[in-house]
């Protein structure tokens, strides 16, 4: 599976296309803004799906335009944010499910913390994992309550750390990175004592 990316929006957000090289079939992930750039990202492919890693506004700003242009199913986690936004999902993404894209597959990981409906998309048989705002090279995704921060810590321990060091993480903002490059920092972060009421921005 090939991963294409482009930055979109006034607060740069990474949109992605997952492309099956055997069939040319593609899926657009996180249509945050700038439909013309998103169409360029899909050039030469046959889009078959729109996928959301989560439903924060910076990741779905061009969703309605792209739905109107592409006429393909919308996949997302059926969490509270999707319900609050009244998104009409065509299919739900659940932990450990798989989704076919041409002859390729992605495995779904529920990775809550930054928000309840956050998922990550791992290419089966490959190294790429689209992590949304689960984590970045410099720290975990921002959290909005102490409970969310504790959820983020649990996600790092139970979901992210079991991934191999070779996992190539593609985040919602900023550069991609190998998990092995940041694993020692994550482990140190998890080993530290954090105030019970802490939440917000954090660095490893």
Name each model feature, range by range.
Residues 1-45, 120-132:
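Conserved beta-strand hairpin/beta-sheet module of binuclear metal-dependent hydrolase folds
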Residues 3-6, 17, 98-123:
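Core dinuclear metal-dependent hydrolase active-site scaffold
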Residues 3-8, 26-29, 50-53, 107-110, ...:
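Short, flexible loop segments at the rims of nucleotide/cofactor-binding pockets, characterized by
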Residues 12, 23-26, 33-107, 184-192:
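Active-site HxH/HxHxD metal-binding segment of metal-dependent hydrolases
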Residues 20, 79, 96-99, 104, ...:
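Conserved catalytic scaffold of divalent metal-dependent phosphoesterases
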Residues 29, 75-76, 131, 171:
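Hydrophobic residues in well-ordered beta-strands that form the structural core
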Residues 115-204:
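Metallo-beta-lactamase
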